[in-house]
Every structure is written in C-alpha cells, then in structure tokens.
Amino acid sequence: MPRSLKKGPFVDKDLMKKVDAAIANNDRRVLKTWSRRSTILPEMVGLTFAVHNGKKFLPVFITENMVGHKLGEFSPTRTFYGHAGDKKTKAKK
C-alpha cells in the first residue's frame, strides 16, 4: 500500500542535512549514505549518492526520472550468477 499523501515523502533527516549542505556550498562530491529507504526528491537531481548495498557503496547519479523512487532501488543487494546448466546438453551443442 502506498504512503499517504498527507504525510509526504520520507527522507532521512541526516541525509537531508547532507543534501542541503551540498546544494548551499555548490559541492558535487559523492554523498555516502546507508539510507536506502529515503525517497528521491527533486532537490536531489544532479547529485551523486554512494548507496550501501550491504557490502559496499555503489555510486548512483540522480536524474529526473528517479524522482519519487527510493535510493535502494538503484543499488541491488543480490548477485545473480545464473542457473546451473546441464553439462550433457552443453557438450552436445
């Protein structure tokens, strides 16, 4: 179920402080964050975040198409190595 409109989008307070400081200083450094649950706001467009995926920080450059989504959507947490194939069918081909 989506979040109520009267509540507004959720953004971690500490993350918003970092964003406001980066905008005020015209600083384009990568902002490191663990807050995957924060919603991307229009003020964040053009900034780069290093979003933690559980193991390392992945750089995410924010574009206009990402507004309204969560930061965690752009930092995958699982690695897919593919399904194990049948060795006999591979040898025949």
From Swiss-Prot:
Q: What keywords tag this UniProt record?
A: Ribonucleoprotein, Ribosomal protein, RNA-binding, rRNA-binding
Give the source's domain of life in one word. Answer: Bacteria
Q: What does this protein do?
A: Protein S19 forms a complex with S13 that binds strongly to the 16S ribosomal RNA.
Family classification? Belongs to the universal ribosomal protein uS19 family.
- Give GO cellular component annotations, separated by semicolons: cytoplasm; small ribosomal subunit
Query: Which one of the record's GO molecular function terms can you name?
Result: rRNA binding
Against InterPro entries, the record matches this protein to: Ribosomal_uS19, Ribosomal_uS19_bac-type, Ribosomal_uS19_CS, Ribosomal_uS19_SF
**Which GO biological-process labels does this protein carry?**
ribosomal small subunit assembly; translation
**What's the protein name?**
Small ribosomal subunit protein uS19
> Could you tell me the gene encoding this protein?
rpsS
